[in-house]
């Protein structure tokens, strides 16, 4: 083969592989379409590669999905925006295939390209494509059509706009529920491009059709449209057209529709204004909180704080809190868990007095819940309550429960408590901490679960930073060093880790006098894992202590370890010795 032909050779291979029987090869080639296009140049890409892709009737969904994705970013390779329209035919074909994810990606790419196209090209090429898909024999084409109307509409002349609105209306009444679902899903996007005069007539007419659909899968997607349309309409129109629909939906016979309402309701409050919220939406939300279907209560409970933020505190206390109290003892653990994940956020909304009177008892009952996730969700948000009621009240009312949870049988709960301790310590102050929580922090170092022991070691470091080296020297270091001879080597490893974390906080003097001797003793341990961890630790201590200490205490210890029978111990000891030499050379 001549030298001239050489650069074209890999491209020829890639093009051949587009037709290869092996799926993986076809896929690799499709993912390199941009390389092929760059090699062919813009004109040949337009005239040869794109037509080839349009005719490519590959039957593998993975290949088609990759093609749909690649073509979305292909404008650059066909000669820029003025030639963007040449990419539409292959994507039109892809948007009619059976596999949903391929169609969705093709629609995404059509929208990406359409958003960059010139207005004249949109009218000449993109809008006819939308019309063809809308009239497609297979429902797959009509489903895809719904997703591109918001791109086609804005640049169309008035006559064409009228036609597009009419076509979308027909899609909303299509025989196939899959098409009506797509029309409901995309109605908000389409509505955002429509002039306000037509919004109140054409779009609201389509919306009404969808809200009265006999398929609950269509109605629940129409619920999502409520919030989107509500933001586009004037408040009075929203009250007239959207509010009655939402109130009806909140009592729909299908729990899936009610579930969607529970998820969306708080967004509508802003659209309709305070008075309709008070008279219509608050009772609707209270109904959903007490719904007979657990899934609906879960959705409603998860939005309780967001909903209460929109109301004034009196309304929340009067109408929502009684339902919240009921939910805190709900028969479904998932409802209680959803409530626990957000209820702490109600404290800033309701204020100090209402929190103390109404919320604290609920917090306490959830902290003692039999289901660990419920307890976990409360613990992780305690700081939100502390900001409202102050640490004294928090410690009196909730601390006994927190101390109890520190020994919880579920390790994730213990872990959440440990991670909360430094924050609690900083707010409780040193005296309170020593009395109530100090012993717990030591106890965790000998937990059965590795993650707890590791978190406990990190916790000691954070406490030493919070209360200072003097306090740590009195309350942490002696207790930690006592444990370094624990019979179980895994616990000895934890103590070593705690020592290595404390050393930078404690400073050179305490490290040399108290911590380093304990580490050197540990270097004579019978377990190789301990010894190589000592070697790693020594390396981290080099920057903390004086050069004389490094030479007189650390180096001899490492030299001894570098002659250990165990290969890992020797490796880490030599690494640490290398570090010492590097420090010596640089100084």
UniProtKB/Swiss-Prot annotation:
The tissues where this chain's protein is expressed are given as: Expressed ubiquitously at stable levels. However, higher protein levels in roots and flowers (at protein level).
The stretches annotated as HEAT repeats are: 2-42, 44-80, 81-119, 158-194, 197-235, 236-274, 276-313, 314-352, 353-391, 393-430, 432-469, 470-508, 509-547, 549-586
Q: Does the keyword Nucleus apply?
A: yes
Name of one Pfam family that matches: PPP2R1A-like_HEAT
**What cystine linkages occur within this chain?**
none
**Mind telling me which residue stretches traverse the membrane in this protein?**
none
Q: Which terms are listed as keywords in the entry?
A: Acetylation, Cytoplasm, Nucleus, Repeat, Ubl conjugation
Comment field on protein domains: Each HEAT repeat appears to consist of two alpha helices joined by a hydrophilic region, the intrarepeat loop. The repeat units may be arranged laterally to form a rod-like structure.
Anything else known: Due to the stability of its transcription, PubMed:16166256 proposed this gene as a reference gene for transcript normalization.
Q: What does this protein do?
A: The A subunit of protein phosphatase 2A serves as a scaffolding molecule to coordinate the assembly of the catalytic subunit and a variable regulatory B subunit. Involved during developmental process such as seedling and floral developments. Seems to act as a negative regulator of PP2A catalytic activity.
Q: Member of which family? A: Belongs to the phosphatase 2A regulatory subunit A family.
Q: How does it assemble?
A: PP2A consists of a common heterodimeric core enzyme, composed of a 36 kDa catalytic subunit (subunit C) and a 65 kDa constant regulatory subunit (subunit A), that associates with a variety of regulatory subunits such as subunits B (the R2/B/PR55/B55, R3/B''/PR72/PR130/PR59 and R5/B'/B56 families). Interacts with CHIP. Interacts with SRK2E/OST1.
Q: Please identify the protein, giving its name as recorded.
A: Serine/threonine-protein phosphatase 2A 65 kDa regulatory subunit A gamma isoform
Source organism (scientific name) = Arabidopsis thaliana (Mouse-ear cress)
